[in-house]
Design a protein with these regions (language model features):
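Outer-membrane translocation/initiation segment of Type V secreted surface proteins
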Residues: 6-14, 18, 367-384, 545, ...
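Sec/Tat signal peptide C-region and signal peptidase I cleavage site
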Residues: 22-28
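Pepsin/retropepsin-fold aspartyl endopeptidases
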Residues: 28-376
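Aromatic-anchored, glycine/proline-accented short structural segments
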Residues: 230-285, 523-524, 869-931
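Extracellular repeat-rich scaffold modules on cell surfaces
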Residues: 365-376, 387-479, 485-486, 490-491, ...
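Extracellular beta-strand/loop-rich repeat segments of large surface/secreted proteins
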Residues: 400-405, 481, 485-577, 583, ...
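Outer membrane beta-barrel translocator domains of Type V secretion systems
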Residues: 654-868, 985-1009
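Outer membrane beta-barrel transmembrane domains
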Residues: 809, 813, 856, 876, ...
Length: 1009
């Protein structure tokens, strides 16, 4: 029995109904449903017998059933009791226990003595749509004796005419008074809840009672749409599953009382326990003078579920009453029993699994009927997966909603109880909610899309998304995304995000992170960052940033500001307003910016600074104390980085936004060390000219491993006929020509990338004898060199014009063999074109330099010829000096362009080696095999250098690829005399050492005419 409700509470309940939109209009029940039963498709139709009636004077419902395959008989259905009772005569061979049990009917006081036994119950006039009968394996009560008002001494149930009860109790929640001693009322002994498939879970245990029959097994078709549902509470302390009687209220002549409401098909009248509220207003009942009844004219209303949304009203003795009106209204104890007649106006659902009863008005607009679909919740509601409903919800008492994954409520919430959302999944509320007792999100997530009039608490680990308006104070210890309005104060120890508004004050001991990435949190009152709290200010695209906007003051007390750039942020020097406060900012943040100002940070060369003023707090991106050179790994990178740090203009804006790795890559491209490496390449390629001049001298001297190709001889008398082919060793004036070429690369080191190059060209010369032993000559020519920096976007070429003089002599007839001296001096004019590209994050440039260079070289060689029976040998020693001058350059291009003054390079080469040649016959042709092996040593300037400047920077020096200090020199050649006037010569020259490879090849065909 509940306490009598006061008028203010009833007024509140009426207001709740208005908020829910509950009315008697037929439109209120259209398309209202839930998907609780969508996964079930099977139900059993159980027909009533012809003796069934809902007439007030003799209402009762009967079905045909057999037990243990016996004769089917008629049983009365009773929602006011539990358990199936059959007389002993239906199981004549059944042996009763010596310890009889008792089952009593509380409304009438009738009872039976007998024994419980498990039997097969078959409803013989039933069908599941596939021809199957409704069958249950369940405990039934076999009555040996029956006691009622007509037989107070009891009768034996051994014969069919004994008058013993044939009853199937399908109710729940009746008190256990009169039962025992070993059995209590339980859902376990209800045959309608244990039909085939129900215990296995494939059929939803429950039933629908209509005026035409019973649907056993709940589906979306018979119970999913149009009903008002009231949640039941489990029976406390029960040893077997059961539900408590439905909560409700009754109003008599304007006086309301909350009370359990029992829909009892075993009773033809109504009773109500009103205590003293109608004292002096009761009269003897017309049909039974021993009962007290409400007198004619008494106004009675019965409501299910704690609201006035579902119920019926009648006037005792009235003429315009609904079909639900009972034969008479008895005034007695024990709550409210509607009797069977309520089923004349309502279809009734019992869900034994979920713990719900449902009501569907047969004529919602009929006289005295109040009906609008809704869900009245109280206690624990464990929703199935993907639960969804558009039923309005009334929270009749403190409730806990749980969902395994997600749930959606499309209609309004009201009620007097508190609502706890216990996850672990997420629940979406799409309509208004009015819950003065408050909402607690203890786990999982909740999304509010409309107006929520309730204080709200969010526990740690839970999350809330507010897309509407919350009218009430919020306490958040979890994650709260406010993209609507909180009309109240907000106390935060969790994390607050979103782009919403708080009309009151924001007090935070947790985190504030406006927006969803970059956004604004607006607070109309004051903002207080308490000790231990933090503000995550994100920087976004287009100069945007997070903003906390306050209509009052912002107080900061030992709080931390975390600065976090987003992926869309374009780094650079800029200012951002991160707090706007009408009353200014009091206090300072400890600033933490892990993305800035450290070598391993994404932006090592940038840092943050804050400035508070009367308008708020400004965040500035400034240059950090990390020098560019702090991230470099090579000398060239360091040189360029140091120079760029010295420049107040130029590339700084592009470089300060880089991380360490990108900066190193930039500093590897920016130094322009291709300009240094080209110098080394040109010095290396000068050896081609020395080699050609030295080779002509050796040929003229008949030296070892010299080419045997003829030259053009010229007689001094000047006659035209005096021009003729002559052997290479001719004493007269000789005109000669040779082609040369090479390709190779100089491998890079940790400081500079390697360079590859190729050269092709020719020389034309003339020489003559001078005195008895000397021969001198003059030569000139042209060559073309191209080069590429390996794995770098740098390349170029050089056009080269050559002029040289050479001379030598031999000392023959010495006891130890012939000695030969060979010397020369040459100069090369070079026109160099160098192109490079620079590309790193946020910057690209194409650069070109064009400049002149000149190479002066001198060489001398001594050779000692030794003839043996096998071959001719010549040990030799060669010394060369190379001086390179370039005229300086200024690159065309952008901010990465370099300028350099003229510079020079002086390099010496010494070579010790051995040449060998041998005559041979190849396929009957005369041939000469020749070869050379030696060791070359470089000294002086072997690492080319370039001193350059960027615009506005200090000068810096970078190193190119070094010339190999030690290298092996190899040559091999073959001359074949193909005929009297034809000679074919081929030769290979190579140089290997210290990462340097150079290969040369030439071929010549000489035909004498």
């Amino acid at each position: 029995m509940g306490a009598t409700m006061t008028i203010p509470r009833m007024a509140f309940a009426i207001g709740i109904l208005a908020a829910l939109g509950l009315s008697q209009a037929a439109s209120a029940q259209e398309a209202t449903s839930w998907n609780l039963y969508d996964s079930y498709t099977t139900s059993y139709t159980i027909n009533y017998t012809k003796n069934s009636s809902l007439d007030p004077s003799g209402a009762a419902l009967y079905v045909m059933a057999s037990v243990a395959g016996g004769t089917p008989v008629e049983y009365q259905l009773d929602t006011g009791s539990q358990g199936m009772v059959l007389p002993q005569y239906l199981l004549p061979d059944f042996q009763q226990s010596s310890d009889l049990q008792k089952i009593e009917y509380g409304s009438s006081g009738n009872y039976a003595l007998g024994t419980w036994t498990t039997q097969t119950v078959t409803f013989t006039d039933s069908n599941d749509g596939n021809g199957n009968l409704a069958t249950a394996e369940v405990e039934v009560f076999v009555a040996a004796e029956y006691y009622d008002s007509a037989n107070p001494g009891g009768v034996s149930c051994a014969s069919a005419d004994s008058g013993c009860a044939h009853m199937i109790g399908i109710g729940f929640g009746r008190p256990d008074t009169g039962w025992g001693p070993d059995y209590l009322p339980s859902l376990n002994n209800n045959p309608l809840l244990h039909l085939t498939g129900m215990d296995e879970g494939t059929v939803r245990a429950g039933y629908v009672i209509t005026a035409d029959g019973i649907q056993a097994g709940l589906t979306s078709a018979n119970a999913g749409t149009g009903f008002a549902y009231v949640q039941l509470q489990p029976t406390t302390g029960a040893t077997a599953p059961n539900w408590q009687t439905t909560a409700g209220s009754v109003v008599v002549n304007g006086t309301s009382s909350s009370s359990p409401i029992l829909v009892d098909t075993g009773l033809q009248y109504m009773w109500a326990d009103l205590g003293s509220s109608i004292a002096g207003q009761s009269v003897p009942c017309a049909s039974n003078a021993s009962f007290n009844c409400a007198p004619d004219g008494t106004q009675v209303s019965v409501y299910f579920g704690g609201t006035e949304g579902v119920g019926y009203s009648f006037v005792v003795g009235g003429t315009d009453n609904p079909p639900a009106t009972p034969e008479f209204a008895r005034l007695a104890g024990g709550g409210v029993n509607t009797g069977i007649n309520v089923l004349a106006s309502f279809t009734y659902v019992f869900d034994a699994v979920g713990g719900f009863v449902g009501y569907l008005a047969n004529d919602p607009q009929g006289s005295g009927i109040t009906f609008s679909p809704y869900l009245s919740a109280i206690g624990d509601f464990d929703m199935p997966s993907s639960f969804a409903t558009n039923l309005p919800v009334y929270i009749a008492g403190d409730s806990v909603f749980s969902t395994p994954d997600n749930a959606t409520f499309a209609s309004a919430f009201t009620g007097i109880g508190g609502l706890t959302l216990d996850g672990p999944g997420g629940i979406i509320f799409q309509a208004n909610m009015t819950l003065p007792a408050g909402i607690t999100v203890s786990a999982g997530s909740a999304t509010f899309q409309a107006t929520v009039a309730a204080p709200l608490a969010v526990d740690a680990g839970a999350s809330v998304s507010n897309l509407g308006t919350i009218v009430g104070n919020v306490t958040n210890a979890g994650t709260f995304a406010n993209d609507g309005t909180v009309d109240g104060n907000f106390a935060n120890t969790g994390v607050l995000s979103g782009n919403g508004t708080i009309t009151g004050d924001l007090t935070t001991g947790g985190g504030v992170s406006p927006g969803h990435s970059v956004g604004m949190t607006s607070v109309q009152g004051n903002v207080a960052f308490q000790p231990g709290s933090y503000y995550v200010a994100e920087l976004g695209a287009g100069g945007t940033s997070d903003l906390v906007q306050s209509g009052g003051q912002v107080f900061v007390d030992n709080a931390t500001l975390y600065v976090a750039p987003t992926a869309e942020w374009k780094p650079g020097f800029a200012s951002y307003q991160i707090i706007s406060a009408a009353g200014g900012v009091v206090g300072n943040f400890d600033v933490v910016a892990p993305s800035f100002g450290a070598i391993d940070a994404p932006y090592p060369f940038l840092d943050v600074d804050t400035t508070a003023d009367s308008d708020g707090l400004q965040l500035d991106i400034v240059r950090s104390g990390i020098a560019f050179a702090s991230v470099t790994e090579t000398a060239n990178q360091t040189a360029a980085a140091t120079a760029l740090d010295s420049a107040a203009v130029g590339l700084n804006a592009q470089l300060v936004v880089l991380n360490a790795a990108d900066a190193r890559w930039a500093f590897d491209q920016l130094p322009g060390y291709v300009n240094a490496s080209v110098k080394g390449l040109l010095v290396e390629q000068s050896g081609l000219i020395r080699g050609a001049l030295d080779g002509r001298l050796r040929a003229a001297q008949g030296g070892v491993a010299a080419s045997a190709a003829p030259v053009v001889g010229y007689a001094l008398d000047g006659g035209a006929d005096n021009l003729a082919a002559a052997p290479a060793t001719t004493d007269g004036l000789a005109v000669w020509t040779t082609g040369f070429g090479s390709w190779g690369e100089m491998a890079g080191d940790d400081n500079a990338a390697g360079i590859s190059g190729s050269t092709g060209g020719f020389l034309i010369g003339a020489d003559t004898a001078l005195g008895d032993s000397w021969r001198v000559g003059l030569a000139g020519g042209y060559s073309y060199t191209n080069f590429n920096l390996i794995d770098r976007n740098a390349s170029g070429d050089s056009e080269n014009w050559h002029l040289g003089i050479y001379g030598g002599r031999t000392w023959s007839g010495l006891p130890a063999g012939d000695i030969a001296l060979r010397t020369g001096l040459a100069y090369t004019w070079q026109n160099v074109e160098a192109n490079r590209s620079v590309a790193f994050s946020g910057y690209a440039d194409q650069l070109a330099a064009s400049y002149n260079a000149g190479t002066l070289q001198a060489f001398g060689e001594l050779g000692w010829r030794l003839d043996t029976a096998v071959a001719a040998l010549e040990p030799f020693a060669n010394l060369a000096y190379v001086h390179l001058d370039d005229g300086g350059y200024t690159e065309d291009g952008g901010l990465a362009a370099l300028s350099a003054p003229s510079s020079s390079m002086d390099t010496g080469f010494s070579t010790l080696g051995l040449r060998v040649s041998r005559k041979a016959t190849l396929a009957a042709l005369d041939a000469t095999l020749r070869g050379e092996i030696g060791w070359r040593y470089a000294f002086g300037d072997i690492t080319p250098m370039a001193t350059q400047t960027f615009v506005g920077s200090d000068a810096f020096t970078v190193a190119g690829v070094p010339i190999a200090q030690n290298a092996a020199v190899l040559q091999a050649g073959l001359d074949v005399k193909l005929g009297q006037a034809t000679t074919l010569g081929v030769a290979y020259a190579g140089q290997f050492g210290d990462g340097v490879t150079q290969n040369g090849f030439n071929a010549n065909l000489k035909i004498e005419f």
